[in-house]
C-alpha cells in the first residue's frame, strides 16, 4: 500500500513539473514527461480512450474501463499539471519579467541535457537519422521565428487554440505556451487562469481534450511503428527551440498584446559580453551558468530516479 502511495505521489510531482514547464513559452511539458520516464505510459493511457471502451464497459463495467485507461495514473498526473498551472502561473510569469536571464538559463540547460537524454534512446544511429534530426530542428526553429498572429479571444478561437496547444504540449520540444503566443492567445488564456474565468477555461479545456484524444493516437502509432525515426525528429524539435530560449537577447521591435502590454516582437541573440555592452546591464553569466548546470543535474537525477 505504501509503495502504491509513493508511486502516485511521484506521478503527481511529475505532473507538477510538467505543468510548470507548460507555463513557460519555449518549454514543453512533454519534455518533462520523457525525461521522467512516463511518456510512453501517458500516450498509451490516453490512446486507450476511444470507442472500443464500450466493449470493455459491457464486459467489465465502469471499474474495468477505469483500469483499462490507467485512470488513477491519468487523474494523478493531470491533477499535478492543473495544480501547477493554477498555482505557478503568476509566479513564473513574474519571474520571467523580473529575473529573465536566470530563469531562461535554467530552462536552456534543461532542454540541452534533454536532447542528450533523448539521443541516448535511439537504438540505430544511422545517417538517415541525422537527416530527421536536422528536419526536426529546422521545423522547430521555423516556428519560433514566425510572426505572431492577433486572434480575438472568441469562444471558437479559444476552443481551437486549446486543441492546437495541447498537441504541442505532449510533443517534447514544442511548447504549447509558445504556440499560444504565436496565435495571440497566450495572454487571454493565462489571464483566464489568473482570474479564474470559468467560461474561457472550460472551453479551452474542451479544446485540449479534443486535441489530446486525437493526436495521442497518431503519436503513439508513430512511436510503435517508427520509434527511432520519431524520437530523432522529436529531438530535432528540441534542438530547434534552443535559440528561442537563449537567455541573452536584444529586442529589435515591440508589439502590443491583447492585454495592452508592450512585449518583444523581434529579438536577436547576444553573447553575455555583447549584452552588457549594448544594454549596460549585468549579464549575470555566472548565475546563469550555475542554473544551467543545476538543470543538467536535475535531469540526470530524474533519469536515475526513473530507472529505479
Swiss-Prot record:
Q: Which Pfam families match?
A: VCA0040-like (PF04018)
- Where are the disulfide bridges? none
- BP GO terms, sorted: cell wall organization
What's any one GO cellular component for it? plasma membrane
Q: What happens when the gene is disrupted?
A: Mutant lacking this gene exhibits growth and cell shape defects at pH above 8, but not at pH values of up to 7. The mutant has less peptidoglycan than the wild type, and modest cross-linking defects with concurrent accumulation of the peptidoglycan precursor UDP-N-acetylmuramyl pentapeptide (UDP-M5). UndP recycling is impaired and mutant shows increased cell surface UndP levels. The mutant exhibits severe colonization defects in an infant rabbit model.
Q: Where are the transmembrane segments?
A: 15-35, 69-89, 91-111, 130-150, 163-183, 200-220, 228-248, 282-302
Give the residue range of the signal peptide.
none
What InterPro entries would the database entry show?
Answer: VCA0040-like
Tell me where in or outside the cell this protein is found: Cell inner membrane
Q: Which UniProt keywords apply?
A: Cell inner membrane, Cell membrane, Cell wall biogenesis/degradation, Membrane, Transmembrane, Transmembrane helix, Transport
Entry membrane topology: Multi-pass membrane protein
According to the record, the protein's activity is controlled as follows:
Active in alkaline conditions.
Main localisation? membrane
Q: Which PANTHER family match?
A: INTEGRAL MEMBRANE PROTEIN, POLYPRENYL-PHOSPHATE TRANSPORTER
- What family is this? Belongs to the PopT family.
* Function summary: Flippase that catalyzes the transport of undecaprenyl phosphate (UndP) across the cytoplasmic membrane, from the external side to the cytoplasmic side. Is involved in UndP recycling during peptidoglycan synthesis. Required for cell shape maintenance at alkaline pH and peptidoglycan maintenance. Required by the cholera pathogen for growth and cell shape maintenance in the intestine.
Miscellaneous note of the record: Is sufficient for resistance to a surface UndP-targeting antibiotic.
Name of this protein? Polyprenyl-phosphate transporter
The organism named in the record is Vibrio cholerae serotype O1 (strain ATCC 39315 / El Tor Inaba N16961)
Amino acid at each position: 500500500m505504501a509503495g502504491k502511495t509513493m508511486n502516485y505521489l511521484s506521478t503527481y510531482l511529475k505532473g507538477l513539473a510538467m505543468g510548470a514547464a507548460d507555463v513557460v513559452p519555449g518549454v514543453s511539458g512533454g519534455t518533462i514527461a520523457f525525461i521522467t520516464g512516463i511518456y510512453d505510459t501517458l500516450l498509451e493511457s490516453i490512446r486507450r480512450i476511444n470507442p472500443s471502451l464500450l466493449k470493455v464497459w459491457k464486459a467489465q463495467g465502469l471499474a474495468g474501463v477505469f483500469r483499462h485507461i490507467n485512470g488513477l495514473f491519468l487523474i494523478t498526473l493531470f491533477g499535478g499539471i492543473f495544480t501547477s498551472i493554477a498555482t505557478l502561473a503568476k509566479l513564473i510569469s513574474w519571474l520571467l519579467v523580473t529575473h529573465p536571464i536566470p530563469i531562461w538559463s535554467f530552462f536552456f540547460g534543461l532542454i540541452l541535457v534533454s536532447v542528450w537524454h533523448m539521443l541516448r534512446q535511439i537504438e540505430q544511429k544511422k545517417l538517415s537519422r541525422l537527416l530527421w534530426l536536422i528536419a526536426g530542428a529546422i521545423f522547430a526553429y521555423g516556428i519560433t521565428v514566425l510572426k505572431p498572429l492577433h486572434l480575438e479571444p472568441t469562444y471558437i478561437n479559444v476552443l481551437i487554440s486549446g486543441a492546437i496547444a495541447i498537441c504541442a504540449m505532449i510533443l517534447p520540444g514544442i511548447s504549447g505556451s509558445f504556440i499560444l503566443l504565436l496565435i495571440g492567445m497566450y495572454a487571454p488564456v493565462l489571464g483566464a487562469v489568473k482570474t479564474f474565468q470559468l467560461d474561457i477555461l472550460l472551453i479551452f479545456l474542451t479544446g485540449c481534450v479534443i486535441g489530446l484524444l486525437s493526436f495521442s493516437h497518431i503519436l503513439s502509432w508513430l512511436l510503435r511503428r517508427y520509434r527511432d525515426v520519431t524520437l530523432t525528429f522529436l529531438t530535432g524539435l528540441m534542438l530547434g527551440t534552443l535559440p528561442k530560449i537563449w537567455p541573452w537577447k536584444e529586442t529589435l521591435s515591440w508589439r502590443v498584446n491583447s492585454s495592452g502590454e508592450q512585449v518583444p516582437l523581434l529579438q536577436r541573440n547576444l553573447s553575455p559580453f555583447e549584452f552588457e555592452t549594448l544594454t549596460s546591464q549585468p549579464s549575470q553569466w555566472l548565475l546563469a551558468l550555475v542554473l544551467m548546470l543545476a538543470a543538467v543535474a536535475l535531469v540526470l537525477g530524474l533519469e536515475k530516479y526513473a530507472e529505479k
